[in-house]
Swiss-Prot record:
Disulfide bonds: none annotated. This is Hydra actinoporin-like toxin 6. The keyword Cell membrane does not apply. GO terms for biological process: cytolysis in another organism; monoatomic cation transport; pore complex assembly. It comes from Hydra vulgaris (Hydra). It is found in: Nematocyst; Secreted; Target cell membrane.
Length: 186
């Protein structure tokens, strides 16, 4: 037996032109058992969604940990400074017991600039894809700017592809437990 799940998202034109008007309808077939298993996994906190990030600092200056911008989930490890010619590692995971992905931005200070690193791992791989982006600017970039490629940020790179933005190379695997490699040269 199959259940038809219909998701309709309608974006309404905002008065200040912040979003374009569009409608999207997506229909996906899901077996009843699979749907119930997903719900059960969320309640039992069995759903794995996280991104493990290794930031390689090839520059001559320290990357100072400046904080995070949470979209869904949070950092589950210590967020530390990264000295020159070193690599820092952290993990960002989804919120426990919630049907969300793992998405957010980490910020490092570098020589009066801010390096913002964004990744988004979806909860539902049938409807969404994983995305990554990096931006070096005078101020912190929020999740929305990096995810949508707005306010000076380039459009994000889909997981499974190398990105190269502002002298920073990065690669995000296309998995629910993604690995994110960032190579910062300064």
């Amino acid at each position: 037996m199959l259940v038809y799940v219909c998701l309709v998202v309608i974006l309404i034109q905002l008065p200040f032109g912040a979003a374009g008007g569009a409608a999207l309808g997506v229909i996906a077939k899901v077996s009843v058992d699979a749907a119930l298993q997903q719900i059960d996994d969320v309640w039992k906190e069995n759903t794995v969604r996280y991104w493990k990030c290794a930031v390689e600092n090839r520059s001559t200056k320290t990357l100072y940990a400046l904080g995070t911008t949470q979209e869904s989930g949070s950092m589950s490890t210590i967020f530390a400074d990264i000295p020159p010619q070193s690599t820092g590692v952290f993990v960002w995971e989804k919120s426990r017991g919630a049907a969300t992905g793992a998405a957010g931005v980490v910020h490092y200070e570098y020589d009066n600039k801010i390096l913002s690193i964004m990744a988004s791992i979806p909860y539902d791989w049938n409807l969404y894809s994983a995305w990554a982006n990096v931006h070096l600017s005078d101020h912190k970039k929020g999740f929305s700017d990096l995810y949508n490629g707005k306010n000076g940020a380039r459009y994000p790179t889909r997981a499974g592809n190398w990105g190269n933005v502002d002298g920073t190379k990065f690669f995000l695997t296309d998995k629910s437990h993604a690995e994110f490699k960032v190579i910062f040269s300064g």
